[in-house]
Amino acid sequence: MNQKSLTKLEFPKIIEMLTDHASSPGGASFCRRIKPMTDLNKIITAQEQTAAAFTRIVKKGIPSFSGCYAVSDSLKRLEIGSALSAPELLRIGKLLQTTTRIKSYGRHENADDQADCLDVYFEQLAPLSLIHI
C-alpha cells in the first residue's frame, strides 16, 4: 500500500492510538513497526488470533503485562561473563513473574474452555515458578 493511501486512511493516527494503549515499551515499539498486511493467509490468521484474544479477554479480563522489562542487554552481558547489578536481577525476576502470570492466564480453567489458535503461544512460555522475589 502506498504512503498516500495510508495517509488518506489515517493509518499513522491509528498506529499512534494503538501505541498509546501498549502496556510496555517493547509493545509500543512493536506497534510503531506495524504495516498493513497484503498476504491473505496472514490476514486470516491475524483475524483468527484477534477473535481468540477477544474471547479470552471477555472471559478472563485483560491480562497484566506490568513487570515486562527488556532484559536483552543484561542477557548479552551475561553471555560475555559480566556480573549483573541488583536492579538488573530485579528486572529479570519481575519478567519471570510476568511470564508466570501470563502462562497462568493462558490455561484453560475448565472443560468448557476450548483450545484456540493462541494456545501455542502460551505453551511456549516457560516460567520459573520456584524463583521468589
Model feature map: region roles:
Residues 1-131:
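Conserved amphipathic alpha-helical "coupling/scaffold" segments
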